[in-house]
């Protein structure tokens, strides 16, 4: 009686083929998971930067002296100038896809260099003379990631001014 110990060549080829298919499937899912994680991190960075920008603007607009310019069309201009009681004249605008804050003649970029600003508009209402409405400014902000996997987000908030008088 003849006993065969070991595998035949065909069994070996079939097992290698099945193993290689499993490796390719596992590798593909791993690469997909990494791409998804990168996209999520880009989105998080864009969102955090947008929240920071809007919060900074909102804090200063909230306590500013009444903004005298009004616009009936919304979205309005992409530049907002106002008088802050402590910091003086402040202006927000977009320059080279970055948000620029001008205080006392000094320009400062307040957005992350990895985040591109696609839109910045201000809608001002309730500040006309004889108007009994609460003055408010709506900030509309569009941001996207500057990476190859561009993630875009649109943010909007409305800030009511605290008209503080002496």
Label for each model-derived stretch:
Residues 3, 84, 145:
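Acidic surface patches and DE-rich sequence motifs
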Residues 68-130:
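Type IV pilin-like appendage domain
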Residues 36-37, 52-72:
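Alpha-helix exit/C-cap motif
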Residues 39-42, 63, 106:
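Glycine-rich, flexible loop/turn motifs
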Residues 106-107, 111, 119-166:
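Short linear sequence signals and composition-biased patches located at protein termini or domain-edge surfaces
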Residues 3-55:
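Aliphatic-rich helix starts adjacent to a transmembrane/signal segment
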